[in-house]
Regions:
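Beta-strand-rich domains and repeat architectures in extracellular enzymes and scaffolds
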Residues: 39-71
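Repeated scaffold domains used in trafficking and secretory/extracellular systems
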Residues: 43-52, 96-109, 146-159, 193-204, ...
């Protein structure tokens, strides 16, 4: 089952004295650009997802305690780029010890976004949709519809695109229906993907890249531009035996494919887009045995790995950011707070945005950093 970096989040308000504070390691320096407190409508007991929008705002879906002690609520909240709350809405309530667990997700459009709420993630046969502007104005009231089993997608924001993956299937066909959409133009394409754990990333030219192990067992790399023009490269998949493509990141003309080996170890393949071939590989390890490799990320020309681990005391998933040198040795990047709950990087600039929590006060912050590799 594909490792999920369960995007957890909370964010922002400027704390002027902090900007310019700098920390460094032997291999990297990280400078805090800004840190803003994040005031939620209700105190989160867990962050479910964070989605960045085209205008720099972001949408957080989170869990909060319900009015009745045995229930929890799922909320959606929109924040602008400096952490001001523009919109908050209760999506639904549920029994955390019950059989039905909800799912909420955001689908981005050019000038609006759709908030979807499914009361039961195991079937996703009932969906309530509400449409908002990025300013927070609601432009369509909630509408509830029933879906056939297998019709609902999981939505993922990847660069300039939305990737909607078929969530469930009872069909005999092994292929998964996937819809990709260029957010700004609205152009879309429907794909049939064999590998249910395929990965997607964006390159610095604004293209969408999809890596999968196809029905022949080979590594298949697909590329799509804004006009939905497709190119496909197929390479030997001998290295994929008893494994799968867990993640991918792109820097310049090189795509780094994360091939899962164990929770603490991956093989990173270097794919040269010009040569259309694998040119190198390196082994990636977690910093310690108590964590797992959550994902790899590109921040400008800097390649990062993210380790995830479970904080038993706080009952929350937390993350650690590592800079990778040319030998794939890791250097932990220092953050302002011990609990990092969400990480977003810019593929064009060496910037990292995090959602962090102060463990004593349970206050949330959105922090922006610039990263540079050391000498």
């Amino acid at each position: 089952m594909k490792r999920l970096l369960g995007l957890l989040l909370a964010m922002m308000v400027m704390m002027g004295g902090m900007a310019g504070a700098q920390a460094s390691t032997d291999n990297a320096s990280m400078q805090l650009i800004r840190m803003n407190p994040l005031a939620f409508r209700k105190e989160p007991v867990g962050l479910y997802s964070v989605t960045h929008t085209p205008n720099g705002s972001f949408v957080v879906i989170y869990f909060a305690e319900g009015e009745k002690t045995e229930l929890q609520e799922m909320w959606m909240e929109l924040f602008d780029s400096v952490g001001t709350s523009l919109l908050s809405a209760k999506l639904g309530e549920f029994d955390p010890n019950g059989e039905q667990i909800p799912h909420g997700q955001i689908i981005l459009k050019k000038d609006r976004f759709i908030c979807e709420y499914y009361p039961d993630i195991t079937s996703m046969e009932v969906c309530t949709q509400t449409v908002y502007r990025y300013t927070g104005k609601r432009i369509q009231k909630p509408t509830t519809k029933k879906l056939k089993f297998g019709a609902a997608p999981y939505a993922q924001h990847v660069g300039d695109y939305m990737v909607e993956k078929q969530a469930h299937s009872e069909d005999e066909t092994p292929f998964r229906t996937v819809k990709i959409t260029h957010i700004a133009s609205g152009k879309s394409k429907k794909l049939m993907i064999y590998d249910w754990s395929f990965c997607a990333c964006s390159d610095q030219d604004g293209n969408l890249l999809i890596g999968q192990q196809n029905e022949k067992g080979n590594l298949e790399i697909r590329s799509y531009n804004a006009a939905m023009q497709e190119s496909i490269v197929e390479l030997s998949g001998d290295f994929l035996q008893n494994s799968y493509i867990s993640d991918a990141a792109c820097i310049g003309q090189t795509v780094y494919f994360d091939i899962y080996l164990t929770n603490q170890q991956s093989e990173i393949l270097f794919y040269d887009m010009k040569q259309q071939n694998i040119t190198d590989s390196q082994t990636l390890h977690t910093a310690n045995d108590n964590s797992y490799i959550a994902e790899i990320k590109a921040a400008g020309a800097v390649l990062l790995s993210v380790d995830g681990y479970w904080n038993r005391e706080l009952q929350r998933q937390k993350y650690q950011i590592n800079l990778l040198n040319e030998h794939f040795e890791t250097s932990r990047l220092p953050l302002q707070h011990e609990s990092c709950l969400y990480i977003f990087t810019d593929v064009e600039q060496a910037d990292v945005t995090t959602i962090e929590m102060d463990e004593k006060s349970h206050s949330y912050f959105v922090c922006s950093y610039s990263i540079s590799a050391g000498e």
